[in-house]
């Protein structure tokens, strides 16, 4: 985890099912997505980016970190979740050091609901739900 801080993530029912499926394929282990070189380390961001390039996406189209940006944008735009819960879900620190010293809430219950909502949202898109393009200019 970034900055070597523990980050606990609530899992939706869909993600739990996917992890079980992946575990059956990989034989389980410490990492859901281990490095291709050793099971003792996680898969690198470069490996994910290389996979995106092989799928035809340029760096301008998408990067692995871009998935986090997309999630942040869509979660914020939904109007359903507090900014604090979204930032905690993404393991972002607070730039305001005074606020960070006093605001240590995990927003756990909201993040549990948000994780399930996000998986349900992606499921709807996968089966043909309406996709609204975001204006890159603003």
Predicted features and spans:
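C-terminal secondary-structure termini that scaffold catalytic or DNA-interacting sites
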Residues: 1-3, 13-17, 21-29, 34-40, ...
């Amino acid at each position: 985890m970034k900055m070597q801080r523990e980050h606990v993530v609530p899992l939706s029912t869909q993600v739990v099912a996917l992890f079980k499926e992946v575990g059956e394929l990989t034989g389980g282990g410490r990492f859901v997505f281990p490095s291709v070189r050793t099971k003792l380390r996680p898969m690198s961001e470069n490996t994910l980016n290389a996979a995106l390039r092989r799928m035809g996406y340029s760096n301008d189209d998408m990067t692995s970190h871009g998935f986090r940006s997309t999630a942040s944008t869509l979660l914020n735009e939904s109007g359903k979740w507090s900014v604090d819960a979204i930032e905690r879900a993404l393991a972002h620190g607070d730039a305001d050091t005074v606020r960070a010293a006093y605001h240590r809430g995990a927003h756990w219950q909201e993040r549990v609901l948000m994780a399930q909502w996000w998986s349900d949202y992606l499921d709807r898109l996968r089966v043909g739900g309406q996709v609204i393009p975001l204006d890159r200019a603003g």
